[in-house]
């Protein structure tokens, strides 16, 4: 199963970008054993429209353009469900076992996702009630992807 991250905005060079790459590298080295593969991290340009509504619409259109025809779409959204790391690993494992080929995980821009993206989502995921800067949300996501692989591999990184 191929997993891609579609993120609105560019990750600037620095410690955050290095940490994202660190977790993506660890994920890639460990994920093949459980049938997960990192396909790509697709950055979608942040809209420069004047209103939040216009920005979300423009970013949503761009995101839809990049989506494969058949994919499972997980959208990070404050309205989403907060689940445990083990439940996230189980969800990914279920997608794999169901023969899902492509899983896309979408991170919105500063204004979030529009209703069209939320409605298209197969699962809305939340990292809790707090608001996270985009860079930290990417770090959290990549760490959780790596953690999901370690859970599936029964690796001690995730303490059971």
Curated annotation (Swiss-Prot):
Give the similarity note: Belongs to the RNA methyltransferase RlmH family.
Chief subcellular location equals cytoplasm
On assembly, the entry states:
Homodimer.
Question: Which reaction does this chain catalyze?
Answer: pseudouridine(1915) in 23S rRNA + S-adenosyl-L-methionine = N(3)-methylpseudouridine(1915) in 23S rRNA + S-adenosyl-L-homocysteine + H(+)
Could you tell me the superkingdom of the organism this chain comes from?
Bacteria
Where is it located?
Answer: Cytoplasm
Q: Name one GO molecular function term.
A: rRNA (pseudouridine-N3-)-methyltransferase activity
Q: Name one GO cellular component term.
A: cytoplasm
Stated role: Specifically methylates the pseudouridine at position 1915 (m3Psi1915) in 23S rRNA.
Q: What is this protein called?
A: Ribosomal RNA large subunit methyltransferase H
Recorded source organism is Bartonella tribocorum (strain CIP 105476 / IBS 506)
């Amino acid at each position: 199963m191929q997993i891609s991250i579609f993120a609105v905005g560019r990750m600037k060079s620095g410690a955050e970008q290095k940490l994202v790459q660190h977790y993506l590298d660890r994920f890639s080295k460990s994920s093949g054993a459980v049938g997960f593969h990192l396909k790509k991290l697709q950055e979608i340009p942040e809209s420069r429209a004047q209103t939040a509504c216009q920005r979300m619409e423009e970013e949503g259109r761009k995101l839809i353009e990049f989506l494969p025809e058949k994919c499972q779409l997980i959208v990070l959204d404050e309205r989403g469900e907060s689940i445990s790391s083990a439940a996230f690993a189980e969800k990914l494992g279920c997608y794999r076992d169901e023969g899902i080929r492509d899983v896309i995980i979408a991170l919105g821009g500063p204004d979030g996702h529009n209703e069209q993206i939320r409605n298209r989502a197969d699962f809305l995921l939340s990292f809790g009630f707090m608001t996270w800067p985009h860079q930290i949300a990417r770090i959290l996501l990549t760490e959780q992807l790596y953690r999901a692989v370690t859970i599936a591999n029964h690796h001690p990184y995730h303490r059971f």
